Amino acid sequence: MRKVIVAGNWKMNKTAKEAAKFFNELKPLVADVKNAGIIIGAPFTALETATRETAGSNIKIAAENMNAKESGAYTGEVSPLMLKDLGVEYVILGHSERREYYHENDEIINEKVKSALAHDLKPILCIGEKLEQREAGTTNDVVKTQIVGGLKDVTAEQMANVVLAYEPVWAIGTGKTATPAQAQEVHAFIRGLLTDLYGKEVAENVTVQYGGSMNDGNAADLIAQTDIDGGLVGGASLIPQKFAVIIKAGDAAAK
């Protein structure tokens, strides 16, 4: 049975000191969570603090990006070996902000996904359409292109270590949210596409999160949908009390 996972994406927020304070507040709030996975995606500068503060807890740590290469003359970049050395377990790849601001395409993202898997890191592959694409009725085409491109040469066996996150770009940080029915419709399409690519057994076991203005008020209704297996949470993951509510909604749905 696939796992419900609630992941936070801090983006370019929180110093190491602020991260330590956050985890000291979050840990007691979610200590009794047994069924849902908990992940925090932290900026590179806070990763060492994050892995140290969560050691021995039920919280796992993700990087928000990485370079596909192990080392070399890539000024300003961080490699999978560096992330592993810090105790990071997951890495968020293909986020719409990386696609838009840093011009990452499916080919670049695919190289990162394959590199993460080769270095025993679990990629959280983000996919999703822009508002004009939804209005043009091309949501499924966009999502299919991103999944097929992002997972090129990824084997069925490796899919056990891949998480997908559907984030409609028009709902990220805008306060707009896909309705539970809208989100479920796309998640069901994604599940069907994974079935076509890898077979039903693999598809049924892949965690597909919803992202896009998920918060403590709407999380339970979204996660209750058949094919929504948790969330990738932005702004609400910066506040321990709000994030804990979302985590507990995921935990309740996972029982």
Regions found by a protein language model. Name each.
Residues 1-255:
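Active-site loop-to-helix "anion-binding N-cap" substructures in soluble metabolic enzymes
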